[in-house]
Amino acid sequence: MKTRSALVAVSTAGLLLVAGTTAATVAHAADLPPGAPPGVCPVDTEHGPPLASPTTTASRLFGARTFLEGPVWVADPGYLLMSDMRAATGPQRVQPSTMLRYTPGPATVETVVAESGSNGLALSPDGTSIVAATHDQRSVSRYQLADLSRQTVAATFQGAAFNSPNDVTVRSDGVVYFTDPDFQRGRRADAMNGRTSVFRVSGSTVTLVDDGLRQPNGIALSPDGGTLYVGAYGENKIYSYPVRADGSTGPRTLFASIAGPDGGTIDCAGNVYWASGTDGLVHVFSPTGVKLGTVASGAGTTNVAFGGTDRQTLFITSGRTGDSGLYSVHLGVPGYPY
């Protein structure tokens, strides 16, 4: 999730930018666990263009919410979960949030976790739980779908509390990557000393990916697991990182530039979809960074996920006051459930 202030757009990307990390040999994609959740992307399938038109428009499914974020599709039995974030409260000025469930045909919307504390959501590789960026406890959490019980995945790095974990993605072997800007830290102590970072969780071990980004926000993995994408909201840029077989990453490069990059997702052809909270569009890029077009929805677009019976419906959350809602459009390629 972003702040509500507008940022100025920057020019289209194309130059290489290397982070202050040590370069290392990256494993070939064939040696990597896939980034796509198991069963989502058909193997050895040719895909056509994702957009019928370079300027596509989504339809509104429902509104009258506060600030929707973090959509994730649960294929069995077939519903979409998302976070609804409210205004900051209490002396620490922390934003409460609920977890909602949208079920299509006939459409219903209901609260499943009244105080989830969540922002970005992802699906575990076995499909039994939701991995959530939970800013209420400055942690990454796991919600079991069977009973919605909550467990902590990660709460500190080298003994220091995170700022406010924002968005999350999970590799097929269970390695978790998440962003940690300070948007929902409120008045709680800055244990990160001004740094906003990207982290990796392998088992119980938390490792720093990058602490040189200004307000990292959305995060996603390529279908072959070989590339990690991160949107830096404070820089108007989307970066990519090569991923090694053990989950570690190489130097970042500039993938694309859009105004206010929020949440992102990937389709099974490797195309990259990124929500812009500034212009209210979802920007679509090829795996090489070529701009394919945009999808228009509500102002203040926050995040995206694929779902539906054929996984070709792109769900889009919008969070701007007065225009918060869920939108959808059917596309030509199936994609990730978060």
Predicted regions and their residues:
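Short loop/turn segments that connect beta-strands within beta-propeller blades
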Residues: Y102-A107, Q144-L148, V201-T205, P242-G247, ...
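C-terminal region of N-terminal signal peptides and the immediate post-cleavage residues
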Residues: V18-A36
